[in-house]
Amino acid sequence: MNAHSKEMAPLMGKRTTAPGGNPVVLTEKRPADLTPTKKSAHFFLEIEGFEPNPTVTKTSPPIFSKPMDSNIRQCLSGNCDDMDSPQSPQDDVTETPSNPNSPSANLAKEEQRQKKKRLKKRIFAAVSEGCVEELRELLQDLQDLCRRRRGLDVPDFLMHKLTASDTGKTCLMKALLNINPNTKEIVRILLAFAEENDILDRFINAEYTEEAYEGQTALNIAIERRQGDITAVLIAAGADVNAHAKGVFFNPKYQHEGFYFGETPLALAACTNQPEIVQLLMENEQTDITSQDSRGNNILHALVTVAEDFKTQNDFVKRMYDMILLRSGNWELETMRNNDGLTPLQLAAKMGKAEILKYILSREIKEKPLRSLSRKFTDWAYGPVSSSLYDLTNVDTTTDNSVLEIIVYNTNIDNRHEMLTLEPLHTLLHTKWKKFAKYMFFLSFCFYFFYNITLTLVSYYRPREDEDLPHPLALTHKMSWLQLLGRMFVLIWATCISVKEGIAIFLLRPSDLQSILSDAWFHFVFFVQAVLVILSVFLYLFAYKEYLACLVLAMALGWANMLYYTRGFQSMGMYSVMIQKVILHDVLKFLFVYILFLLGFGVALASLIEKCSKDKKDCSSYGSFSDAVLELFKLTIGLGDLNIQQNSTYPILFLFLLITYVILTFVLLLNMLIALMGETVENVSKESERIWRLQRARTILEFEKMLPEWLRSRFRMGELCKVADEDFRLCLRINEVKWTEWKTHVSFLNEDPGPIRRTADLNKIQDSSRSNSKTTLYAFDELDEFPETSV
């Protein structure tokens, strides 16, 4: 028997006395008191953005209104003992009565049994509130409970008590989600307890099971909370450094509702700008730097994805990109492709990340052991002039999904004309234009011009109405050999155009029709014109007079299509864009509103006109709906008259409607159209040079696709460079003059320019004419005693 009755009470049941005050009795709430009423529960759910019965559909995007650590959670099953949203730990403390045989003692025993059932809640509450001593006592109680129960699977029981069954969140995750001054000590206690009970590996690598945060571990949370010391402790304790967080919250599809970082802890540290943790993870032998997520993206893909259009974020992304690439020393890391077949370079181009794209294309590493990681190599420098070799791997059209094709053909990129000004893209396109594209463009212009001339002559010297159509192959004075050859040429060329443009239309994407600079509408008008020509020729050969309608439309479209070839001149290239943009944006909107007015007022005015007499002498020009619409159209263009129609039911009302119509259309709508067209022309004029360059780039690639493979290989740009042993790359030489950057020491490859050949554009392009066609990058390095400056 105990000497004092108080010794029978557990430690948690003792009175607590405040310093200098009277003892305070902490009583435990009844289960009924712990259960919120229906009204109060609904009130708290509304605060957190929940609904009583949430309905999730597959089509609607998820709304992440509930954080990873929420203290307000629904209990739909009726059994809330496993929930990780505990009440205050003080609610579990009760005063032990002095008499063990009294009814209050029996009640205390029952309450003790209830506290054991709520042990999980109390552990979660202790770790979230930073109660170190209480956590030690609770873990000791849990360990004692395991010892008293025989035949118990201790590891499973402990994991059950330390893990929330509804989300898979452990008390370790709970502690990391609620950072406080005691968090480090709590983490140490939990890890020591797990190791002592042989559940460390399961405990530290437990993953979220909730759909939103599925796969997230304690290591991910520690990194996200920027806890470097705790991260190091977790890694040393055996945390999985290659775990993948695949929850919906981390899906790039919902990037505006969540955060995509590449799933792995290393990618998370890199995307949140934590270089110390990145270094810590990369020094760990277990870390797989080349790990790819469920979309095939590696860490470099993830960095490209999180880059934005403001300088601060781009700067840290570039630093992280550099750090990871240099520390890994693995060139293949940047050549890995995701599930869409894109490397980090190609992904930057597809997403329109101009700053990151510029950084990758012009990255130059001067240290000799790591020089193979560069994409730019300075061959020689003399004063302000330097000659650089740009790596064309995945840039030129010789590879699938090349950067050049992605930028030119991806109409979803708003700043693609800006990216085409980057090197080596700008010089590469310029070289292609001068080498073969301008000659092909000129030949195409000549053929189409001759085609239109021939079509016009054949149409002009056709049989007139008073002459019968000849037999298709009857060579008489009405159809000479010259006219027959002309028709055959027109038919053959129109057939070629229809086949070529038909294939182009078939390959068009819906987004191409939304862009003025995609040439989609030119493909349509070229195809329609060719089909009209073919149709008119066959109708004529079979003596159908309806051929004339097709022929007239074909001639009009044929000469209008000559506007396509204005892109060969910078001063005229923007006119076709202006016309397309005015028609598709301004005129179509005007016509929609105008037709509404025209139909409405036409019906109203025609309804006011009385029926015409049989002699039709006093018939009004507004007598029918079609006549009224025609007269209103004349008023719009200033050819109609504002006359009072005496044979109308209400002449004054009729005149009032006419005046209102003129004000709304002739005065208001037409002037609005003129103002909108003026604004469109002004906006296009500001971007005229960039628009012209994008037009020309698309034309160059279209002509390049028409070349046979053997001819395309002859026109391949660049020169073969040896970067390292068995590492040869195709590089483009670009000479640059930078008067603002004088170089006292540059990490270049050759000591002088060597013999060079003059080109038409010496300051931009310089072809090497050295005796060896292969440029060896290890040929020369300067002495180390001079201070090195950036190139």
Curated annotation (Swiss-Prot):
It catalyses: Ca(2+)(in) = Ca(2+)(out); Mg(2+)(in) = Mg(2+)(out); Na(+)(in) = Na(+)(out); K(+)(in) = K(+)(out). GO terms for molecular function: calcium channel activity; identical protein binding; metal ion binding; monoatomic cation channel activity; monoatomic ion channel activity; sodium channel activity. It is found in: Cell membrane; Cytoplasm; Lysosome. One of its GO terms (cellular component) is membrane. Activated by cannabinoid that binds to the vanilloid binding pocket. Diphenylboronic anhydride induces pore dilation and enhances cation permeability by promoting the conversion to a homopentamer. Keywords: ANK repeat, Calcium, Calcium channel, Calcium transport, Cell membrane, Cytoplasm, Ion channel, Ion transport, Lysosome, Membrane, Metal-binding, Repeat, Sodium, Transmembrane, Transmembrane helix, Transport. ANK repeats lie at residues 117-148, 170-198, 214-243, 261-291, 298-330, 340-362, 398-420. The keyword Transmembrane applies. Residues 95-105 have a biased composition (Polar residues). It holds the Pfam family Ank. This is Transient receptor potential cation channel subfamily V member 3. It comes from Mus musculus (Mouse). The gene is Trpv3.
